[in-house]
Amino acid sequence: MSAPTGQPAYVLHSRAYRENSALVDFLTPQGRLRAVLRSAKGKAGSLARPFVPLEVEFRGRGELKNVGRMESAGVATWMTGEALFSGMYLNELLIRLLPAEDPHPAVFEHYAATLLALALGRPLEPLLRSFEWRLLDDLGYGFAMDADINGEPLAIDGMYRLQVDAGLERVYLLQPGLFQGAELLAMSEADWSVPGALSAAKRLMRQALAVHLGGRPLVSRELFRKP
């Protein structure tokens, strides 16, 4: 049997576990992994924090792994203010939505790229909307953004509502929570210069995420509301 090899990872969340250990949720190309980190107050424990690129060797076949080795694999992504809150939001989304040990290498790569963009001070809203959409799509919850549930191209002057896990349905009577065709088409092209496109994208992603998050609110969203 070959010895375990290290793999790239980021810490999503860590909490104290028993005496000197920590229970850590990692994001890896092989999915979300939970592992026990021994001697969490030592050198390894100082690395077990979010936004630090790591190389981690996991041991064990069960759902709860053990960290055999953990090393830094690069410079930590330094963020403050709303960029930091945004990173925490990404972590919470992944913990809540990503199944354990379900490989999603594209999610891992997009997460790392999004952290870098946040640290560089790129506009937050487009980054968050892109991450939300690509996460939903990679998990199989995506839907067409340029056609309705009947396969018809979206009309610029049309009004649509989201049928979760089905797609966009055209409606002809005004009602709360509708989206304009022009906004949706702008979203499909990531053209945020169209008036109202970013705010509509935020509403759309909230609706799309809500059913998969269940009834529990995201704690990290409250950080944006605090003065």
Curated annotation (Swiss-Prot):
GO biological process terms held by the UniProt record: DNA recombination; double-strand break repair
Pfam family, one: RecO_N
GO cellular component: bacterial nucleoid
Keyword annotations: DNA damage, DNA recombination, DNA repair
Disulfide bridge map: none
The keyword Nucleus is annotated on this UniProt entry: no
Classification via InterPro entries: ARFGAP/RecO, DNA_rep/recomb_RecO_N, NA-bd_OB-fold, RecO, RecO_C
Keyword Cytoplasm applies: no
Similarity-based family: Belongs to the RecO family.
NCBIfam families in the record: reco (TIGR00613)
Protein name: DNA repair protein RecO
Source organism of the structure: Pseudomonas savastanoi pv. phaseolicola (strain 1448A / Race 6)
